[in-house]
Swiss-Prot record:
Lineage: Bacteria, Pseudomonadati, Pseudomonadota, Gammaproteobacteria, Enterobacterales
Top-tier EC class: isomerase
Source taxon at top rank: Bacteria
EC number(s) on file: 5.3.1.14
Keywords, ordered alphabetically: Cytoplasm, Isomerase, Manganese, Metal-binding, Rhamnose metabolism
Organism listed in the record: Escherichia coli O17:K52:H18 (strain UMN026 / ExPEC)
Identification of the protein by name: L-rhamnose isomerase
Description of how the protein assembles with itself and partners: Homotetramer.
């Protein structure tokens, strides 16, 4: 430990103790909060099923930065490089299109064996895995409908894909000793004015009920469902709206996924957390950064990221909220994107843990809103950075921007050699 870091740490402990915060306890609590990193930042959501195919479903990865991963070995190596630069507990979130097989596998035929490399890798790196069926970038999703499709055979294909995905998810949880959160998102919707908004939702309701009909051990698998306001090519109508999935998760007691980019630009998911928790057992968060639309920019340490973290900590939702990331920027170094976004999420959680929440609650209850605002603003200037640097030191990761040197070296030695 350097003398400078030690001095800053001791001063920070004193400053936070003066406002009633035990920084050691804050770091212990931070180690209870894994962040699930999304594999698809590493290859622009290409996957291994048809890497040269186009990305569909109303989502876009923009940019053409060189060196993206082309197979499982490269993607896992890139993830390891990123994870070495991120302190504390982590998980990995996989989509079904990241299966590995010597022969083509139809999506409704995926099995645990197609993900054994990921499980062995997760064991070696002491990671939990989360999962997602991939209801996009496929010939049978080309007309914009999957689980709500009017064609019975096509709809059944996607139902079977999601059912197979649940078994893969349960396999992850059983093998790794930590439940896999499997999130269902579908792109279903219409570009222009829709006359029958009810029938697709009736079909989706029945399809989801069939998907989750097989009882799985909750110690291994957790179902989550995710809404969206609109997508490219589905601007006028989205079958799986917020109201639909809020009702579904409440009535079926599944987890509800809140994605930071899936609502109107004036809405924030930090304000939705406490409301949703009154009705659903668990939440999955997709922390992202929408710029004017669901653009999935890299997560910043901005007001909304901080507000999301603060909601989790203030209401002691550690065991009911699963934190995942969802962004994909192909215009910058993809490993840097992972590191920046994940470190920012963890910084926000640390800052939330260092907040004098008990004192703030007292002021709020007493109606002293002037003091509440003053204290909220003053605590922003407390030396949280010194606590973060100590956390990084204890987890053998770079504290400041020194991590960039490692990313640049990896880019020169590894990424630049890829076609």
């Amino acid at each position: 430990m350097t003398t400078q870091l030690e001095q800053a740490w001791e001063l920070a402990k004193q400053r936070f103790a003066a406002v009633g915060i035990d920084v050691e306890e804050a770091l212990r609590q931070l180690d209870r909060l894994p962040v699930s990193m999304h594999c698809w930042q590493g290859d622009d959501v290409s996957g291994f099923e048809n890497p040269e195919g186009s990305l569909t479903g109303g989502i876009q990865a923009t940019g053409n930065y060189p060196g993206k991963a082309r197979n499982g070995s490269e993607l896992r190596a890139d993830l390891e490089q990123a994870m070495r630069l991120i302190p504390g507990p982590k998980r990995l979130n996989l989509h079904a299109i990241y299966l590995e097989s010597d022969t083509p596998v139809a999506r409704d035929q995926i099995k645990p064996e197609h993900f054994k490399n990921w499980v062995e890798w997760a064991k070696a790196n002491q990671l939990g895995l989360d999962f997602n069926p991939s209801c996009f970038s496929h010939p049978l999703s080309a007309d914009g409908f999957t689980l709500s499709h009017a064609d019975d055979s096509i709809r059944q294909f996607w139902i079977d894909h999601c059912k197979a995905s649940r078994r893969v998810s349960a396999y992850f949880g059983e093998q790794l000793g930590t439940p896999s959160v499997m999130n269902i998102w579908i792109p279903d919707g219409m570009k222009d004015i829709t006359v029958d908004r009810l029938a697709p939702r009736q079909r989706l309701l029945a399809a989801l009920d069939e998907v989750i009909s097989e009882k799985l051990d909750p110690a291994h698998h957790i179902d989550a469902v995710e809404s969206k306001l609109f997508g490219i090519g589905a601007e006028s109508y989205t079958v799986g709206s917020n109201e639909f999935y809020m009702g579904y998760a409440t009535s079926r007691q599944t987890a509800l996924c809140l994605d930071a980019g899936h609502f109107h630009p004036t809405e924030v998911i930090s304000d939705k957390i406490s409301a949703a928790m009154l009705y659903v057992p668990q939440l999955l968060l997709h922390v992202s950064r929408p710029v004017r639309w669901d653009s999935d920019h890299v997560v910043l340490l901005d007001d909304e990221t901080q507000a999301i973290a603060s909601e989790i900590v203030r209401h002691d939702l550690f065991d009911r909220v699963h934190i995942g990331l969802d962004f994909f920027d192909a215009s910058i170094n993809r490993i840097a994107a992972w590191v920046i976004g994940t470190r920012n999420m963890k910084k926000a959680l640390l800052r939330a843990l260092l907040e004098p929440t008990a004192e703030l609650r007292k002021l709020e209850a007493a109606g002293d809103y002037s003091a509440r605002l003053a204290l909220l603003e003053e605590q922003k200037s407390l030396p949280w950075q010194a606590v973060w640097e100590m956390y990084c030191q204890r987890h053998d990761t770079p504290a400041g921007s020194e991590w960039l040197e490692s990313v640049r070296a990896y880019e020169k030695e590894i990424l630049s050699q890829r076609g």
